Structures are given as structure tokens and as C-alpha cells.
Amino acid sequence: MGAGGTQSQLRLFRNPGFAALAVMNFVRGMAFATIIVALALYADLFETSGFVAGLFGTAYAFVRLVLVVPVGRWIDVRDAKRLLVIGLVLQVVVLAGYVFVESALQLVGVRAFQGVSSITVYLAGTAIVGSLGPEGDRGLWVGTYQNVTAFSKLSGDLLGAGLLFFVGFESTWAIFVVLSTLSVGYVLKHLPAEPVPSDDSSSTAGKLLGLLKRRAIMALVAFRFSFSFCKEAVLIFLPVFARLEFGMNALLIGGILAGGRFTKSISQGYIGQLGDRVGRLHWFILVGIVLYAIGTAMIPLAVHADEFIDPVALTVAGREETIPGAFFVLFFCYVLLGIADSLRIPTSVTMFVREGEYQDAVGSSISLRSLSWQIGATIGPVAVGVMTDVLSYTAAFWAAATLALCAGVLFATLYRDEPPPE
């Protein structure tokens, strides 16, 4: 990234509103990434089947699916800051709930409740940052905000995984309860009490139908229905694959995920700014889709890694650890997935915010973005889990990669450039 782009991003943190959103987003993302690592450990601890491990993702996504439209509409007609604070308080309760998890069924329940806090914080935060960003710099604002998300998840992969490795579940969740509580106070103090620009003259259905008449929105929604199947399946089952097939500990799983997170943390802001400058945002999305499919299809190659990559032995805090060859294959795959996400995510968010502003419905547009994701996200983890039980991890990951490519074809077929509506 050039010096000018870096300086532009750093300048955003002088804005009190953006800084408050960034702090909140950092804590949220770090906790989320730590939970993803923990799910693989829980799957091993509770000796779950692939189906039950899939429920860890499906329970979370199903609740988000149910709530995404009403939450988005709330943002359009009421104070988005108030909703954001409610979601952050629920996040504290969720993290406290993880302290008491003692079975797979309890974990599924906590994951479902996490879906409530997650969708609330995600939609409110994204809508606010998209609307605060001035015209011409919105891609920079959105990209930098996503950059914070990526960097926070990178921190979760490393620091959160380290906490799980050294101090265990209960102490890790207690630390995140404290951090999340502090982030609530910071948002209350520094985020301006300004709702997202709203217009309550039409119904939720009317807003969504109006947005779907736009070809860009139609293409994005159709693509996200199937692409989310792949994305969420990888998110849940790559760590589970690493744990159950190769016995990797929390540090190694976190290290794998850190590869992709690091890529996103250093590139999304630049990609957002590049999109502002050159336009043609749909090309960024298409290239990202293809790269994601390739990275997903390569994941099963890890089972052959020891044939050409020797294990590496090292000592961590007095403990002897062996890094299997599969670690390096999975690390490379997740780096490739991180590059793909860097191309796709900031440009997609910018397109949804832009189209939402045309119709004074930023909240509904962002909620439509999430709604289109949640169906595949709900089905994907369980479907892939069943495939790992009945077939194999190879079949499951290849099926996910195929669906990602189909999503790209669908997007390319439906997308058309259109002028703003009259």
C-alpha cells in the first residue's frame, strides 16, 4: 500500500465517530476469531460428529437469518447507535455464557444467542460507517473499517488462540467479557448520537423490493446465496479439519487462520480506495470468487503434505511441539482465501451502501446483504458436516469450491451497470 493510502487510513482514526466504531469492531472481531478456534477444540473435546460440528455454524447463522430484516429496518427508521449499544451489551452476555459451556448442546445454544448479538452489531456498525463516510471516500471508510475487522480477527487468531492454549477456556472468555464491556463505554462516549439517514414512508418489503429492482443488487444477492455455502463451510470446518485430522493445537490453528487475516488486514483499505478510483467494482468481486474457489479446492491436499514437507519440531514456553507438513499447506490455502476476500468484501459493501443511499435505505440494503448470505450460511455447515461423515473432507471441500464457482457465473450473468434512479 502506498504512503498516501496509509496516511488516508490513519487520518480516519482522528474522527471520534470512526475511532469509536473501530474500537468496538476490533474487540468484536478478536472475540469472534477466538471463538472460531475454540469451536474446533470443543468439537474434539465433545467428540462430535460432522453433523453436530456443522450445527455450531448453522445455529448461529439461522438466528441471523431470522433477525436480519427486522434489524435492518430498525436501522432505517430509528437510532442506529442505540441498536448498536444493545447489540454490544448482548455480546457481553454471550461471552459470559461461553464460560459455562459443558456440552455440545449447550454450545449450540450459546452460538444461537451469539447470532442475536452478532447480527445487531454487524448491521448497525456497517450502516453507520457507510453513512458517515463522505461521498467519494466511502470506499476508503468501508475498506478501512473492514481492515480493522481483519486485523482484529488476526489478533484473535494469535492472541486469542494463545490464551486458549495457555490459560484455557474460562479465563479466555473472562478476559473478553472485560474488553467487550469497555468497548460499550467507549461507544457510548464517543460515537455521535446520529441515526442513519432514514425514511419510514414505505414498508420493509417495499424497501427490499425496490432495492432488488437494481441489477447490481440482484446480482450481488444471487451470488451471495450460493457463495456463503462455501465461505461458512470453510470457516467452520478448516479448523475442525486441522484439529481432528492432524491433531493441531490452538496455536497452530490460530496460525493457519492468521495467514488469511493478515492478508486482509493490510489490503482491504487499499482495495476499497482503489475501487473508489478505478470503478468497475464487479471485476474485483469476480476475481475474488475465482481465487476463493481455488483456495478451497486445495485444502484437501493437506493430507498428502507429509510426503513432501518434513514436520518441524520446536519448543513453545517449555512445551515440545511438532508442526506437521499439513500446517504449511493449510496456511497457504488460507492466505489465498484472504487475498480473495480482500478483493471481494470492501467492493461488495461499497456497492450495497451506494445502492441503498439511492433509495434512502442504507440499513435495508446492508440487511439485504446479510440476508442473502444467511441462507447458504445456515445450510452450508450442516451439509458439509454430513458430507464429512458420509463421504470425506475432500468431497466436502470440493463441493464447496464448486458452489463458489457457480456463484461467480451467476453474478457475471446477472450484473449490469445502471445509472442512479431518478
Regions found by a protein language model. Name each.
Residues V37-F51, I236-L252:
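Short amphipathic helix-loop junctions that connect adjacent transmembrane helices
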Residues E47, D79, F100-L105, G247, ...:
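Helix-breaking motifs and short loop linkers at transmembrane-helix boundaries and internal kinks
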Residues V66-E102:
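Conserved MFS/SLC helix-loop-helix module at the cytosolic interface between two early adjacent transmembrane helices
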Residues L67-D79, Q268-R280, T388:
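Helix-to-loop junctions at the C-terminal end of transmembrane segments
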Residues R82-G97, W283-M298, W398:
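Structural signature of the two symmetry-related core transmembrane helices
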Residues V110-F151:
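Cytoplasmic helix-loop-helix junction between adjacent transmembrane helices
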Residues V177-V196, A407-Y415:
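C-terminal membrane-cytosol helix-exit motif in multi-pass small-molecule transporters
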